[in-house]
Amino acid sequence: MKVEVCSFSGSKVYPGAGRLFVRGDNKVFRFVNKKSESLFLQRKNPRRLSWTVLYRRMHKKGISEEHAKKRTRRTVKHQRGIVGANLDVIKEKRNQRPEVRAAARAAALKQRKDKRAASESEKKAIKAKSAASSARGQAIKNAKVAARR
């Protein structure tokens, strides 16, 4: 047994009861009685009529039991190790004194600067060497051109 719902009042429409209204755009409306159909055709708002299900739902009528508020899950911070660092190592670093940490940072910076300076000086040496060889090659070319003339 298929029980329909009234398009206006929201009440149940049992088989063999109620009225069916088909609009020009083929939208079907089911009404429990002539009263609902008439009010629908008058374009009355069912939320403003106190006997409709929509009104009762909107104004929280007939809800007998007060159900408890839904509890939201709280996020809990949890520490765990990451790739390349164990949890013990992380805790140890966190518990270090600021002076020790600053000294370690300064040492790491100095090491990085020294490494960069070394690589730059190496690049300069290679560049100077290639420039000298290209200058020598250019001088030989110039000498050959001068010899032809």
Curated annotation (Swiss-Prot):
It is found in: Cytoplasm. Residues 116-125 have a biased composition (Basic and acidic residues). Residues 96-149 are annotated as: Disordered. It holds the Pfam family Ribosomal_L24e. One of its GO terms (molecular function) is structural constituent of ribosome. There are 2 genes for eL24 in S.pombe. Component of the large ribosomal subunit (LSU). Mature yeast ribosomes consist of a small (40S) and a large (60S) subunit. The 40S small subunit contains 1 molecule of ribosomal RNA (18S rRNA) and at least 33 different proteins. The large 60S subunit contains 3 rRNA molecules (25S, 5.8S and 5S rRNA) and at least 46 different proteins. This is Large ribosomal subunit protein eL24B. It comes from Schizosaccharomyces pombe (strain 972 / ATCC 24843) (Fission yeast). The gene is rpl2402.
